[in-house]
Amino acid sequence: MFFTCGSNEAMVVSGFCRSPPVMVAGGRVFVLPCIQQIQRISLNTLTLNVKSEKVYTRHGVPISVTGIAQVKIQGQNKEMLAAACQMFLGKTEAEIAHIALETLEGHQRAIMAHMTVEEIYKDRQKFSEQVFKVASSDLVNMGISVVSYTLKDIHDDQDYLHSLGKARTAQVQKDARIGEAEAKRDAGIREAKAKQEKVSAQYLSEIEMAKAQRDYELKKAAYDIEVNTRRAQADLAYQLQVAKTKQQIEEQRVQVQVVERAQQVAVQEQEIARREKELEARVRKPAEAERYKLERLAEAEKSQLIMQAEAEAESVRMRGEAEAFAIGARARAEAEQMAKKAEAFQLYQEAAQLDMLLEKLPQVAEEISGPLTSANKITLASSGSGTMGAAKVTGEVLDILTRLPESVERLTGVSISQVNHKPLRTA
């Protein structure tokens, strides 16, 4: 089951599966009943009234001191909370406060023993800081933090503090009398200084008045010079303005003449334009009409030539297409002829080979005898036996031709004589 606690309280869960124990400050925790245990510890701030009665100071004077301290168990620091749980778990707030009070009182007594009454009485802040510092370093090991410490009261049974007050009162009265005498002395000195400063101020005032008079006269002379200069400049400016006005009048007159002359020129230009228009109407218009007519004729001739050229181009294109079609038809016919020859060769294998050889033999013979037809002169050499002359040439040619079937057989592997004597076979 779940257990919750506020921010001023911490829970410690121990038992099964809780080693080390779980500490939760201001939250909730799940606890297994019967096998786990939950304990709570207060995190409230405790106010302690720390009294130290008749403690002997450094000079052996017994005094009593009362201080107010605010302490609490620190729940945000896990280590301090663990230390506080080890020392105070299961104890009440009163018991925790009593332990902290005893610790603080011991440190307060120790600090009082190391200081004089005057130091404690006059410098309470120093005493409070020392107690706070020493006590905090000790209580932090218990998990307790000192929030604040203030010295509330100091008293004694020997009238030591009262005697200190009397001595202080006498010192104050003495200081007051000395201060009064010094004040009277300072007043006389200040009065004399005031008189001296008054005379000095009077002299300085007269000097300043003389300087002011001098500056006035100098400035007045400068102003007079400036006024006369400005007056002369004004007179000169007037004369210059009169001259400028006359010059402007003359310029206006010249401008009027220029305008009149410009108007005359404009009238002349209008007359010239009118005459040019008359000339254009009488001469230029007919010439332009003739030129326009010639341009139209040239354009018509140009269009006719372009149309003729386009017609010729179209004729050439159609002739080319017809020739291309004829070439294609001829190529198709040749291809068809070749295909039929291939079919015939496949059908009549040896006969077809013989036919091809016989068809090409005249061409071979023509190529062999070709060089003889182009020869201009034949020179024969003989060893003295056999025929001579033309019969010799004819015999050589016939001998070449008779050996032609053997050459064909060596090149193609087909014997013309054997093919000729064999009966035809189909595939």
UniProtKB/Swiss-Prot annotation:
GO BP term (any one): protein kinase C signaling
Pfam families on file: Band_7
GO (cellular component) term, any one: endosome
Organism domain of life: Eukaryota
Bilayer disposition of the protein: Peripheral membrane protein
Alphabetized GO MF terms: protease binding
Sites bearing Phosphoserine, chain numbering: 19, 163, 385
Modification type Phosphothreonine: residues: 387
Main subcellular location of this protein, as a coarse class: membrane
Compartment(s) of residence: Cell membrane; Endosome; Membrane, Caveola; Melanosome
InterPro entries in UniProt: Band_7, Band_7/SPFH_dom_sf, Flotillin_fam
Alphabetical UniProt keywords: Cell membrane, Endosome, Membrane, Phosphoprotein
Keyword Transport in record: no
Recorded family membership: Belongs to the band 7/mec-2 family. Flotillin subfamily.
Function recorded in the entry: May act as a scaffolding protein within caveolar membranes, functionally participating in formation of caveolae or caveolae-like vesicles.
Subunit-level organization: Heterooligomeric complex of flotillin-1 and flotillin-2 and caveolin-1 and caveolin-2. Interacts with ECPAS.
Protein name per UniProt: Flotillin-1
Gene: FLOT1
